[in-house]
Amino acid sequence: MAKLERLNREEFARRRRQLMRIMGKGTIAIVPAAPVRHRNSDVEYPYRQDSDFQYLTGFGEPESVAVLIPGREPAEYVLFVRDRDPLRETWDGRRAGPEGAVAQFGADDAFPISDIDEILPGLLENREKVYYAMGSHPEFDQRVVAWLQGLRTQARNGRHAPLEMVALDHVLHDMRLYKSRAELQLMRTAGQIAADAHVRAMRHCRPGGHEYGIVAELLHEFRRHNADTSYQPIVGGGANSCILHYRENDMPLVDGDLLLVDAGCEYSFYASDITRTYPVNGTFTPAQREVYDIVLAAQLAAIAQVRPGNHWNAPHDAAVEVITRGLLGLGLLKGKLPQLIKDGAYRRFFMHRTGHWLGMDVHDVGDYKVGDEWRVLEPGMVMTVEPGIYIPAGSKGVPKRYANIGIRIEDDVVVTRTGCEVLTDGVPKTADEIEALMAAAAAA
């Protein structure tokens, strides 16, 4: 992989301009950076910038606040950042400082974060509306409330606080739902890295290994391309494949079991999310293949519904119909297809939705409904498509040959002008393709 791809300054500037057009004059938006979080004692978690802050600024440091003031001269975009500090930079890394915030990150003006209590109330003064995501940063919420209350006490002096607080996250998250060309290119890269990692994991899967060994293969591929995990990988063999959010990843890989691997990477702040399920020994049993082919057919039917003009729930409806019909064919459900779908009988074995939005967050922002109606799919929206069937041992009325079969197949799909594009098609998906890849790896 070449040098880490990044969005250019103009991409961030375009987003800020778009947001300020939506806000209108006489308004102000306040967006804080993510706080540093402690793992234990004096050990910190690796710092990851707040997605909304990153989306608007591209500025990766903590203890920062972005302020947007449409129409303000001479500075519409103001950053509050940490001052340069040679001693702290020796310990913790370089800082941009106020000068760097302007020169490198496109701020119109920048101030030390230590001065925010003196400066920001003046920026709030006499604005009609303040756009802020109340509740997203509880500690910072208290400071915003204090600034507003302080202004209200000075109303007799002609200093007026904004009359209305508008939920910034609602506006900003609708913007984030539509990916630009530059964003989609990063998501293609994230998808390709994750696809390569899944192929590597398949090739290293053997009876006698362990789930954590598969995790290691995934992480190896992520890190060698300067990517990280977009969420904790789920690597569950046998009975663990039937646990949707299995976390331990520490059990042996057993001959005859299936292995469900749900793992994606984050590359330059954009996530991928892939799931594949395959036999530990490289060969599906007849029962495993029966169930696998139903899930694959459901996923392909769902992907076929990802196109402009269809509503968000269309892929799920398609997957539900295929899975319910398949469960009827296996004898795991009994009754008439329409009634079983209406009653949700399939939820015994397929209990989750078929997908979610994908972007800077793996479960990305954006409403699924507009009012009471499912949202209509439009070009630039990115979603996962991930139906599954899970049959834990001891399920009442289920033949033993299906016990502990947990299968999910997941890809990342972008809505295009004419249909859709699968961003993660670099991983084998049919049972025959999977067996061929694993056989070749075993023979190598």
Task: For each feature predicted by the language model, list its residue ranges.
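Active-site neighborhoods and metal-handling regions in enzymes and metal-associated proteins
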Residues: 1-444
